[in-house]
């Protein structure tokens, strides 16, 4: 039986005693996702890598390519340094039209908890708006994440963005 103030989240055959998370931690993780989306929506790309551990994995793939393995990823970065390099490249690129993104994150759930790591999943939808044009649906999919919990701070250890469509977007510049 969970302690008063704790909520049990059980998934994937995980034993109940390992699935007990405090409501406060769950709210912290939801806030972490909200701040992640806010950072990207606000165009603060220089801050994006700060959501990750130094040794991390960031991938964007399709549902089909996820089954085929990392070699088929649309984007694959293996460190925070690689993320900063990508941000610099975006700033220097002249091959894309600047635009805004607006993330909607929903269906958030913690799938597993062990030690100082959580496995979480959430759905996302991103709208894209070019200057003087209407907003359009850009991509949708799910985040499949491993989140490190240490010293009261959360960081992504692994973030896999799985696009619903097997057809890759024509322009995948900004982080998802």
Task: Give each language-model segment a name.
Residues 36, 48, 83, 120, ...:
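Hydrophobic pocket/interface hotspot
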Residues 27-31, 74, 81, 138:
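A generic "alpha-helical surface" signal
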Residues 9-12, 102-104, 109-176:
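A beta-strand edge to alpha-helix "cap/lid" segment located at domain peripheries
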Residues 36-38, 91-98, 131-134:
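Short helix-to-loop capping/linker segments positioned immediately adjacent to catalytic or ligand/cofactor-binding
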Residues 21-24, 71, 135:
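Conserved aromatic-histidine-acidic binding/catalytic patches
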Residues 54-123:
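A solvent-exposed, acidic/Ser-Thr-rich amphipathic alpha-helical stretch
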